[in-house]
């Protein structure tokens, strides 16, 4: 029997406008509580952004944020993986040697805030505000006093995959993954949604066969591999569709919540 349901956000749980039906979710969460089913949101977004999206029900949801770098439930951090200061500073120096990297299109997410350089591309900054809360400008990354979870950086549609490959080949200790929207997330090399959901299942004393996950993109790949019941919307990447036990309708038609209601 399914005891934990986790879903990606963009391209999966959210519709094309980046929205969902809150009243429908409230009814679902009430039903899940009676059935003893946990609900988790697993996203590359930061915790502050997720809590804002789900403000009305945030105490009833498990948040797997920052592409698996942080798991929070009832205000407690069940799992976290942050980059030491020297590590993220040296990682930045290495990234600057990439022919695909543009520091004006880079954001770091931390526990207290998100950070961009004060030379940030303003179009990129506007884009980033859609997915991140409390973005602060700094003159140098050395000015940051926060704990850092990940880098996010944008490429062009033509260079995002080769840029991701460059990071994975040339920058030690990190893992880059495409998140959609021509961007990649760069996290510690042992971090992803799959690792986080395995750790969460352990905390909840669940077997992975009791876990269902919905995802559409490559940052969902490991999560879809480790859960007992991977489900993908029809708009998912081919690599995700191949892993799926079940393929459902397009995310724009709220297919994920409809499927969840049938459990």
Regions found by a protein language model. Give the residues of each.
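Mg2+-dependent phosphoryl-transfer enzymes with acidic/Ser/Thr/Gly-rich catalytic loops
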Residues: 1-4, 22, 185-263
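Asp-based phosphoryl-transfer active-site loop
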Residues: 3-18
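Active-site metal-binding loops of divalent metal-dependent hydrolases
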Residues: 9, 45, 215-217
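Active-site phosphate-binding/coordination module
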Residues: 20-122
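Anion (oxyanion) recognition and catalysis
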Residues: 33, 96, 100, 168, ...
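Short, structured coil segments at secondary-structure junctions
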Residues: 57-59, 67, 170-172, 226-227, ...
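Conserved acidic, metal-coordinating active-site core of Asp-based
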Residues: 94, 101-214, 221-222, 235
């Amino acid at each position: 029997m399914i005891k934990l349901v986790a879903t990606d956000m963009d391209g999966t749980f959210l519709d094309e406008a980046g929205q969902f039906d809150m009243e429908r979710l409230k009814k679902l969460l009430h039903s899940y509580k009676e059935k003893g089913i946990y609900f988790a949101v697993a996203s590359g977004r930061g915790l502050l952004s997720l809590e804002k999206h789900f403000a009305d029900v945030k105490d009833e949801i498990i948040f797997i944020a920052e592409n698996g770098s942080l798991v929070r439930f009832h205000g407690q951090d069940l799992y976290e993986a942050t980059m030491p200061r020297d590590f993220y500073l040296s990682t930045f120096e290495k990234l600057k040697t990439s022919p695909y990297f543009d520091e004006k299109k880079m954001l770091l997410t931390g526990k207290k805030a998100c950070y961009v350089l004060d030379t940030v591309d303003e179009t990129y900054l506007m884009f980033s505000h859609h997915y991140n809360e409390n973005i602060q400008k700094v003159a140098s990354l050395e000015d940051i006093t926060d704990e850092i979870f990940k880098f996010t950086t944008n490429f062009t549609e033509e260079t995002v995959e080769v840029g991701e490959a460059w990071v994975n080949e040339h920058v030690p200790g990190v893992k880059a993954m495409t998140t959609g929207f021509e961007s990649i997330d760069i996290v510690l090399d042992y971090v992803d949604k799959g690792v986080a959901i395995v750790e969460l299942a352990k905390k909840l004393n669940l077997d992975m066969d009791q876990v269902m996950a919905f995802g559409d993109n490559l940052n969902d790949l490991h999560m879809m591999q480790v859960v007992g019941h991977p489900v993908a919307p029809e708009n998912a990447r081919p690599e995700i569709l191949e892993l799926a036990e079940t393929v459902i309708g397009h995310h724009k038609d709220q297919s994920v919540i409809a499927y969840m209601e049938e459990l």
